[in-house]
Amino acid sequence: MKTISSLAAIFVIALFASPAVASEQVPFNGSWVSHETYDVQFPVMFVHGTATGYATRIGRYTATYEEQVDLLTGSSVGAITLVAANGDVVFATQTGQGDPTPDPDIFSIVEVSTITGGTGRFVGATGTFTIARLVDLTTGDSSGSFSGTISHPAP
C-alpha cells in the first residue's frame, strides 16, 4: 500500500510539475531586415511591412507586420507574425516609439513585442522581445536586431 501511495504522489507531482517546465522562459534573439510601405492619413501613418532574419528557437524566419503610427508623438501600436522555415508561427502585439536621428530620413525605432501565441511548436507561447532598428523613410528599408524571451510547451 505504501508503494502505491508513493507512486501516486510521484504521478501527481509530475503532473503538476510539467506545465512549469513547459513554460520556462528561454532566450529569443535574432536579426531583422525589413521593407515597409506607408499610407499617411494625418495624423496617423499606417505601416505595412515584411521582414526576414534568423532567430534562436525559430531559425530562419519571415515576418509580416502592420502598425499604426501617431505622427504627432512617434508612438505606434501593431501586430507581427513570424513564420519559421517549417511553417510554425509566433504571433505578437507590439508598441513602439520612433525618434529622429541626425539624418532627417533615418528614424530609430524601438518596439516592444508581447508574444500572444502561435501554431505548431509555438501553440501557447508567451514572452516578450524588443526590436531595435533603423529605418530609412525614403526607401522603407530597415535593419536591426531583437532580443527577449519566449516560452512554449515542450514538444
Segments and roles (model prediction):
Residues 17-19:
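N-terminal signal peptide c-region/cleavage motif recognized by signal peptidases
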Residues 1-8:
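Bacterial N-terminal signal peptides that target proteins for export
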Residues 21-155:
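Beta-strand-enriched cores of mature, soluble protein domains
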